[in-house]
Every structure is written in structure tokens, then in C-alpha cells.
A protein has these predicted regions:
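Acidic, low-complexity, intrinsically disordered interaction modules
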Residues: 22-64
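N-terminal acidic leader/helix
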Residues: 1-33
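Short intrinsically disordered terminal tails
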Residues: 1-6, 72-78
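Short, mixed-charge aromatic SLiMs
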Residues: 61-74
């Protein structure tokens, strides 16, 4: 499940990259993709919480330590 979520987040990262370089309202669109990715992480955490709280923590840590930072660097240019 974690690998499938990572694939989805990688796709969203690429959408954000392309959007930031293409569209006039790119920041708004990129933030929408960011929110979709965050929603996927929250849903994945909720789905695994009952059966595997450790995996939920792993998913949230992956988001906070890796993907959130990648998204923010693209969107805010840091």
C-alpha cells in the first residue's frame, strides 16, 4: 500500500512541476494538486489505522519528511 501511495504522490509531484511551468494561474492549480496528494495520504492513513497503526505512522512520516517538502519546494521555490 505504501508503494502504491508513493506512486500516486510521484504523479502528483510531476503534475505540480508541469503546472508551475505552464499555466498562468499555476500556483492555484499546484496547490490544488498538493491538497489532492495530502488527501490521499490522510485517506491511506485512515484506511490502515485499524489494522496497522505502525504503517499509518510510517505513511504520515513519509509525507512530512519527504513529500511535503518536495511539493513546497516546487510551489514556493525554496
Amino acid at each position: 500500500m505504501k508503494e502504491k501511495l508513493m506512486e500516486h504522490l510521484d504523479i502528483k509531484l510531476e503534475q505540480v512541476r508541469r503546472t508551475m511551468n505552464t499555466w498562468e494561474d499555476s500556483a492555484d492549480m499546484a496547490i490544488a494538486f498538493y491538497n489532492q496528494a495530502l488527501g490521499a495520504v490522510e485517506l491511506a492513513g485512515w484506511l490502515v489505522y485499524q489494522d496497522n497503526p505502525e504503517l499509518e505512522q510510517e505513511i504520515l512520516k513519509m509525507w512530512n519528511d519527504e513529500y511535503r517538502i518536495k511539493f513546497e519546494k516546487i510551489i514556493w521555490g525554496e
